[in-house]
Structure formats: C-alpha cells, structure tokens
C-alpha cells in the first residue's frame, strides 16, 4: 500500500504503473530498433543476394553449414580453429526457420547488425548523460554511415556481433548491473574469443576501484566475470578433445599468437590501428574536436569514460598482439565508444565550427564508403569488396565456359568449387595455389594448367609496394615477395590472356593454355555452352554471355 495525499493506493496499482512504464520503454526501444533495421536493410537492398566474400566463403559459412546439416559444432567442412560457434549457430537457426539461402544469411546479419547499432546507441546515451543536445543520435548516425560498419553489417563475420555484445556488456557494467553484464560477456566470448578482454577489464576494475573497501562485496561482484572465462575455457577444452589442439590447429596458433609478438610487427600493427581509429576516413576531424573538448568537458574525464576508454584501449592492444592478420574489422568493438566520444566532443565546439566539423566528418565517412585510400587496404573496409565479388563472379562464369581445371588462389577457389557460395550453379574443378610468387609459378612449368585466374588481393595506386623501403620491411618481417603479374605468368607458362576485368583500379585475368590439345577440349565445351544458351558472344570486358 502507498499513501498519496491522504489516499492509500493498493500495491496492484503500483505494479500496473511500473508495468506500464516498462511497456512504454520497451515500445520506444523496439521502435528505434525497427527504424535502424529498416534503414540498414533498405540501404543494403542491392546487396542482399551478393555471393559470399573471402572468410565468409572459406570459414564461417562452411562452419555454419556443418551445424545446420549435421549438428557438428566443430567444423569438418572448414579447418577448425579457436573461433567459437555463436555466430554460426545464429545462421543455422536462421536457415532452419527461413531456408538455406544467401538472402536469409544477409538479412539475418543485417538484423544482428541493427541490434548492435541499437546497443551502441544505448551506450552513447549512457556515455553522454549530462551533456546538452542529443549526441547519442549523432553517434548512431556516424556509426551507421562509417564504411567499416556499413560493409561489415551484411557480412557473416564475427566482429559485428562482438561489437554489439561488447557495447551491451559495457552499458550494463556502467549501470552497476554486474550479473547481467557477465551474462552478456558469456554471449560475447561465444561470438568471438577476443571478447574475453571485456570481462577481464571489468573484473579487474571492480577489484582495483574498491580495494580496501568492502572487499567481500567487491570479490562477489568481480567473481561474476569468471563466468565468461569458464565458458571460453569449456570451448577450448572441446577443441582440445576433438582436434588435439587447444586452438583447433597449430598453424592458426602460430600465426595469431607468436607471429604478431615480434617487436617490429607489433609496432607496425599498433601504428596501423591508431591511424585507422584517429586519422583515417575523416576521423582526424573527430580527433581534433576531442582534443579541443578534453579541457572543456569534465564529463570526458569521469568514471564512465575512464572505464570505456580502458576497455577500448585493452581491446585494441589485444587484437594487435593476438592477431596475425592486420584487419581493421577487429576494431569494430571500439567504434561505438569512439563515435560517442566524437559526438560528445563536437558539442563542445561553438555552433558554427561544430556545424562545419560535423558536416565534413559526415562527408568523409560517406565518401570513404566509395572512395578507396591511396594505399593497400583490405577490400572489406568499404564497398570495394562488392567490386571484388563482381569480378569474381564474372571470372567464374567465364572460366566455367571451359572444361579444364582452373589454377588460382583462395578466395577464387571457393567461388569456383562450391555452388553454395553463389558464383556458379555447379562446381568447377580447381587446382589451388598458395600464391602467385615466382617459385609457385615455376613449379607449374612441368605440368601447366589449362586455365588460370590471376588477380591481386590489394590495390596500390601509389605503387607503395614497389618502393625499396616497403620491400625491405615487409620482406624481412612479413615474408613478402612481389607476386608475378598476369603478363609474366602467361609468358612463363605459355598461356594467353583471354579476359580481363577492371574495376576501381582492381584487375582480374583469365589465362588459357595455348596447347592445341587442351584448347580443343576447352573450345568443345565452350561451343556446347554457347549452343545451350542459343549462341552469343562473351564480352571482352565483362566475361558474360
């Protein structure tokens, strides 16, 4: 019972009032999520049937297919490694409910990305409490138009769910809901193993912050964050039992544990991480605003931001020290914190400079989706990955008009060999090569392949890879050797270039052996295909009928 102005209200009234409040909050949250999901799905509309790209085709889709078809949580179709099965289970569930298709995969990932953006929005609200304006909406907009988020939101990779559950765990921790934060961390480490950084940071923070004061309660709160450690430990035990290796396979362990710890490689990787976070894609504008706002906004130095900054720094250091591949997508869990900081810092600027800075930052982020940087970068950092997939699809279709096996490298091999990846209706025989280095090509001279598809996996418009400094550093620390060009390979193996695809500075080539017997076999198959489709001529540029 409650007495209000001389009247007594029954407990049932209070329960109804509380329930009504929670219903309004839930309705608003659902509305925000629905709006974000609708925008993301509509924005990605032309890409919803896009074939699988790179690690999707080589690792995560095969692993998810194992769960879907046979219930195997440790993959047989792909090389097993330390990555937990959380994302793959989500895809298997989506396929079970809506059918095994690329469209189902893309929409399932966009719905997951919408949840991640929504949790990032809630985190931005928490981080900007007490500030004027609506910086949380600015942070959400910056995140959604950023090239890395936009590209990754449709791809079946681990780092998007890692971002969402990192943001959720941090939000719950900042609200002192430690048990719920620990449960979110369990889901996080089952999405990606590097998520273990978050519960370790939270547990240590509690013990350090409350040292000497109520140690019993502090230890109980910190102990919750042993749950995700135990969950990840059980997964590693399962890997050890079924594969004989703690991380699934020894090559993965060597490449991701010992290889990055060389001081030179670590320093270079760290500089690259810092450049991407604070300079690239127009981030230098937000960084400048943050430096200006540091003295003006005490909010940026309070406990909330200290926890967030500690987590962001710990994650960036962890993926730098424990990851052989220099992929920017590993930094996705840092972006909600980064864009919240940029949005809050922009509020400290005078109105006119704030409008100019925000406009320029938005323009840079949107432009970075379509404009490639002048140095080598992973295609998955922006929409360049779509151009690469288009070239793969055209090259696969052109090669499939011939009967011979195609010699090429990953990921082109997966485009040809597995129809589930969306490139061909039927598998085409492949001869997988590790690379296009001179030694690899020289080994083919005794038995040249009938067909080859040659391409580069990175753009280099400023010819950075041709400089002496680049060749020395990457040759010494990354075992880099310049791959042979399509022209060089064609001369070495007595082949001719029959097709070439150019897109945004990227080139892919189809080479055909000039041996008369081999050519006769290939042309007979090609003529049969032309007859099937009623004649036609392959375009020299597109490779389509």
Which residue stretches match the model-derived regions?
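Transmembrane-helix motifs of polytopic, lipid-linked glycan transferases
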Residues: 107-129
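Hydrophobic/aromatic-rich transmembrane helices and adjacent perimembrane loops
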Residues: 153, 159, 191, 197-198, ...
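Perimembrane helix-loop-helix junctions
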Residues: 13-15, 174, 197-229, 296-300, ...
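Multi-pass, polyprenyl lipid-linked donor-dependent membrane glycosyltransferases
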Residues: 55, 82, 105-112, 138-168, ...
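Membrane-embedded, lumen/periplasm-facing catalytic core of multi-pass transferases
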Residues: 124, 173, 359-430, 450
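Specific aromatic-rich, kink-prone transmembrane helix
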Residues: 117-122, 142, 161-180, 184, ...
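Signature aromatic-anchored transmembrane alpha helix within multi-pass, membrane-resident enzymes
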Residues: 16, 26, 30-35, 183, ...
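Membrane-lumen/periplasm interface segments of specific transmembrane helices
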Residues: 42, 220-290, 318, 322, ...
């Amino acid at each position: 019972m409650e007495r209000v102005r001389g009247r007594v209200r029954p407990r049932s009234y209070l329960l109804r009032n509380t329930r009504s409040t929670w219903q309004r909050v839930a309705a608003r949250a659902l509305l925000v999520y629905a709006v974000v999901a609708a925008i993301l799905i509509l924005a990605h509309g032309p890409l919803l049937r896009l074939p699988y790209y790179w690690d999707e085709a080589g690792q995560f889709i095969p692993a998810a297919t194992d769960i879907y078809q046979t219930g195997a949580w440790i993959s047989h179709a792909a090389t097993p490694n330390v990555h937990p099965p959380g994302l793959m289970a989500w895809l298997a569930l989506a396929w079970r409910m809506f059918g095994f298709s690329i469209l189902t995969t893309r929409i399932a990932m966009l719905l997951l990305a919408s949840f991640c953006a929504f949790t990032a929005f809630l985190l931005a609200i928490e981080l900007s409490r007490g500030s004027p304006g609506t910086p949380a909406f600015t942070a959400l907009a910056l995140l959604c138009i950023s090239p890395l988020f936009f590209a990754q939101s449709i791809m079946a990779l681990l780092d998007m769910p890692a971002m969402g559950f990192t943001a959720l765990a941090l939000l719950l921790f900042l609200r002192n809901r430690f048990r719920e934060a620990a449960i979110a961390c369990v889901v996080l480490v089952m999405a990606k193993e590097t998520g273990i950084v978050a519960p370790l940071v939270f547990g240590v923070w509690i013990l350090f912050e409350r040292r000497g004061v109520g140690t019993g309660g502090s230890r109980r709160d910190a102990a919750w964050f042993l749950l995700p450690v135990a969950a990840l430990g059980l997964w590693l035990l399962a890997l050890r039992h079924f594969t004989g290796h703690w991380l699934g396979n020894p090559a993965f362990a060597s490449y991701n544990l010992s290889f990055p710890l060389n001081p030179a490689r670590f320093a270079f990787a760290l500089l690259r991480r810092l450049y991407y976070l604070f300079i690239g894609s127009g981030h230098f504008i937000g960084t400048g605003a943050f430096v200006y706002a540091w003295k003006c906004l005490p909010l940026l130095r309070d406990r909330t931001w200290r926890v967030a900054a500690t987590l962001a720094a710990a994650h960036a250091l962890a993926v730098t020290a424990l990851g052989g591949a220099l992929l920017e997508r590993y930094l996705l869990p840092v972006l909600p914190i980064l864009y919240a900081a940029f949005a809050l810092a922009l509020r400290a600027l005078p109105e006119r400079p704030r409008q100019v800075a925000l406009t320029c930052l938005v323009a840079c982020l949107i432009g970075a989706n379509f404009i490639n940087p002048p140095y080598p970068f992973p295609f998955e950092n922006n929409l360049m990955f779509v151009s690469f997939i288009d070239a793969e699809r055209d090259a696969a279709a052109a090669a499939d008009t011939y009967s011979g096996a195609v010699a090429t490298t990953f990921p082109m091999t997966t485009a040809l060999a597995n129809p589930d990846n969306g490139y061909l209706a039927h598998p085409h025989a492949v001869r997988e090569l590790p690379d296009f280095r001179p030694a690899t090509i020289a080994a083919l001279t005794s038995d040249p392949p009938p067909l080859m598809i040659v391409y580069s996996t990175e753009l280099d418009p400023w010819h950075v890879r041709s400089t002496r400094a680049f060749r020395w550093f990457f040759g010494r620390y990354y075992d880099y050797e310049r791959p042979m060009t399509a022209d060089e390979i064609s001369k070495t193996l007595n082949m001719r270039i029959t097709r070439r695809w150019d897109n945004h500075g990227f080139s892919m080539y189809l080479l055909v052996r000039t041996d008369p017997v081999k050519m006769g076999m290939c042309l007979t198959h090609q003529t049969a295909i032309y007859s099937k489709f009623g004649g036609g001529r392959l375009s020299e540029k597109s490779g389509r009928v």
